[in-house]
């Protein structure tokens, strides 16, 4: 029985007579069966990787699974023959609320590639019921509401497995749900998500407010609950320990079932710690091994040879440090082990910068990972060099053999084959070769760089994608885009270092320039998508400024025909899949030295956008691949920025006082036009922040940014030249396949 026959049997009625909801449910169950039939990926070496992460931003799964199972076209045609549109079926599916930004999306891409390469490897995380939050805009401000996603018809499978997780005053029994991870034309792996049976979604009050002390009911409600107070920090510790204790118990259970001796755990298991959230897996594994009779020395040796750590940030505040008394309040049984680990480090090294427990009695999670793991990797070439030379230099001096780079990547199944089917058709027509499993074949596109027919066809694909975005946004939110405008897009987590505020200053420049009578040759549409953490006031204030500008420009008849600002609500994977194929100018404007890698830059590049960015993160490698003519780089270098911080010689007020243009742009934030629309206090605070602090040096780079962006828009008018830039970017994007990244992890770290 083929897939279509199984689908019809599961549905139990004629497709033409079924609702979209019924068809979706039948497809989901048929895909689950097909994934089971594919069988699990099994390592010939008897070795398995477990990828532990606080978040997995997996996106909707139906189409991705149909593509990986090789039945997407078959299903699409079957539905069409019965008067059904597969795109409408896809809209029925809720997006899982299991992630936030690049960290979680990377984890999802990695799981896809691990399965596609046929490696034995599973993800381990938590089953958040309400996600980060659903973003709505009210009075030009972000408001957070719960984002429930779990339905009776779900990709989650109840495994019947659970473990007891001990805390100081009580224990909780977990419940394990699995989601199948299908490999492209290969076997399947699993994403293991742990939950509690007593979770209660009804305890959430106004917005996303809830009792943070009620651990038995709130533990798996939200991803990254507000940690701006002690209760929030304690809840984060509860969550992290619940995740790693379940993960560690599950790993040992699997090993024992396979008949492995736990004394040889490191021969059969590798645990990849994705950022610092899962770091307590190190002392927890040691605790569980010593409880089974293994000596402390041996347990430490085993765990050190089992765990590997990926660093994802250069921002010091993101390297988690928990007060000892907080850990004592939640997991006192771990503290003797953590103290033992810290004592061994202190006995060997007298440098305070490498101590696990610092002089303020805080436990540094990343330091524990580096001392008691066998690998430390950065996620882009520049990032890894900064870790070795600056941020983690004391550790590199001790353990140079542990440090390695693994430049991030993205899965082309989702970010090309699923979300940009028209571009795939163009690639197939112009003879790229089998890029679906070998992304390096994209280089074959360079043969078309002087083919005017191919160039025009590529421009037409982009135009069709812009029109598709226009239609989608109008249908979903009533926003009307001008699809003849240039689409300039910045979509990423809202953070000062990503510098959405600098984009704001460009918009102000352009608004004032148009008001002065300087009309652009072509309309410009600036699109933002971003959520700000609920307690991150400045980030929320930046959203407020963007939304105020959106209204100001929309209602100004002198400017609206030439400039549009749109901030999409509740930016998520589904929205990214619509925005990225339509993008023409990719905004990657973080302060040099602050973005570890970025993966949005790769997705845009793959879909034919041209990058406007700083020499930061993976932008550096994009620049090296495409050359000076096919990317727009501005701003000071990472070395210059690091020197500014070292010397404390950047003073934002000097730029404000000494440059009339910068002063005009910044002051417009508190102009009568803006004050009439926005909240006065908020606008005053952002204005003061830019002049008095500006920790991420917006005013340092803004003039160069404005001038470079004007050059981008001028160059855009030479359509053939622009199409050639598009081809080069697409052709060179093959390096950024997560299949390549995972192959490198396996070659150098996992050896699965």
Predicted segment positions?
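A conserved ligand/cofactor-binding region detector
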Residues: 1-752
């Amino acid at each position: 029985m083929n897939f279509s026959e199984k689908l019809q049997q599961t549905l139990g009625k004629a497709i033409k007579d079924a609702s979209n909801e019924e068809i979706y449910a039948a497809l989901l169950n048929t895909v689950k069966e097909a994934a089971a039939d594919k069988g699990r990926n099994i390592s010939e070496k008897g070795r398995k990787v477990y990828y532990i992460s606080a978040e997995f931003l997996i996106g909707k799964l139906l189409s991705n699974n149909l593509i990986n199972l090789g039945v997407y076209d078959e299903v699409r045609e079957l539905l069409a023959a019965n008067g059904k549109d597969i795109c409408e079926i896809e809209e029925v599916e809720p997006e899982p609320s299991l992630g936030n930004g690049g960290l979680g999306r990377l984890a999802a891409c990695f799981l896809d590639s691990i399965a596609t390469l046929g490696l034995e490897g599973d993800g381990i995380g938590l089953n958040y019921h309400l996600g980060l939050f659903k973003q709505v805009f009210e009075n030009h401000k972000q408001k957070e509401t719960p984002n429930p996603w779990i339905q009776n018809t779900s990709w989650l499978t109840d495994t019947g497995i659970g473990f007891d997780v001990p805390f100081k005053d009580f224990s909780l029994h977990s419940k394990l749900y699995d989601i199948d991870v299908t490999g492209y034309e290969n076997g399947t792996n699993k994403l293991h998500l742990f939950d509690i049976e007593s979770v209660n979604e009804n305890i959430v009050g106004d917005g996303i407010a809830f009792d943070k002390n009620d651990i038995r009911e709130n533990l798996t409600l939200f991803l990254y609950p507000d940690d701006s107070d002690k209760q929030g920090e304690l809840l984060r510790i509860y969550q992290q320990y619940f995740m790693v204790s379940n993960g560690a118990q599950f790993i040992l259970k699997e090993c024992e079932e396979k008949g492995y001796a736990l004394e040889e755990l490191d021969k059969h298991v590798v645990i990849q710690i994705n950022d610092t959230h899962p770091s307590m897996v190190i002392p927890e594994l040691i605790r569980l091994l010593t409880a089974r009779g293994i000596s402390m020395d041996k347990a430490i040796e085993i765990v050190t040879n089992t765990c590997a750590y990926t660093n994802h940030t250069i921002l010091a505040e993101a390297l988690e440090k928990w007060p000892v008394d907080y850990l004592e309040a939640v997991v006192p049984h771990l503290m003797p082990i953590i103290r033992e680990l810290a004592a061994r480090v202190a006995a060997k090294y007298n440098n305070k910068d490498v101590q696990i427990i610092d002089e303020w009695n805080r436990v540094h999670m990343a330091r524990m990972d580096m001392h008691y793991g066998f690998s430390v990797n950065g996620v882009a070439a520049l990032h890894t060099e900064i870790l070795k030379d600056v941020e983690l230099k004391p550790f590199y001096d001790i353990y140079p053999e542990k440090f390695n780079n693994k430049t991030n990547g993205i899965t082309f199944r989702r970010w090309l084959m699923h979300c940009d089917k028209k571009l795939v058709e163009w690639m197939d027509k112009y003879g790229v070769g089998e890029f679906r499993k070998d992304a390096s074949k994209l280089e074959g596109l360079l043969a078309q760089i002087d083919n005017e027919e191919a160039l025009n066809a590529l421009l037409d694909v982009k135009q069709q994608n812009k029109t598709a975005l226009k239609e989608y946004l109008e249908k979903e939110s009533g926003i009307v885009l001008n699809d003849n405008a240039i689409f300039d897009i910045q979509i990423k987590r809202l953070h000062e270092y990503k510098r959405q505020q600098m984009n704001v200053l460009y918009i102000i420049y352009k608004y004032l320039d148009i008001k002065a009578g300087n009309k652009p040759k072509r309309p410009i549409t600036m699109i933002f998508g971003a959520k700000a953490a609920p307690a991150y006031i400045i980030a929320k204030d930046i959203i407020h400024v963007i939304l105020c500008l959106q209204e100001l420009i929309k209602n100004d008849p002198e400017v609206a025909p030439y400039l549009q600002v749109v901030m999409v609500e509740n930016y998520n994977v589904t929205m990214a899949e619509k925005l990225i194929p339509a993008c023409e100018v990719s905004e990657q404007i973080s302060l040099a030295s602050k973005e570890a890698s970025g993966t949005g830059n790769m997705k845009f590049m793959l879909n034919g956008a041209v990058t406007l960015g700083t020499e930061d993160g993976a932008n550096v490698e994009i620049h090296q691949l495409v050359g000076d003519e096919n990317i727009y780089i501005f701003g000071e270098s990472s070395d210059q920025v690091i020197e500014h911080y070292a010397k404390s010689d950047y003073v934002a007020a000097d730029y404000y006082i000494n440059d009339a243009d910068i002063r005009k742009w910044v002051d417009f934030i508190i102009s009568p036009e803006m004050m009439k629309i926005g909240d006065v206090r908020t606008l005053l605070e952002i204005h003061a922040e830019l002049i008095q602090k500006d920790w991420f040096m917006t005013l340092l780079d803004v003039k160069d940014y404005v001038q470079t962006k004007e050059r981008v828009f001028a160059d855009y008018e030479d359509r053939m030249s622009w199409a050639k830039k598009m081809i080069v970017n697409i052709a060179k994007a093959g390096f950024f396949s997560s299949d390549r990244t995972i192959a490198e992890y396996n070659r150098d770290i996992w050896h699965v």
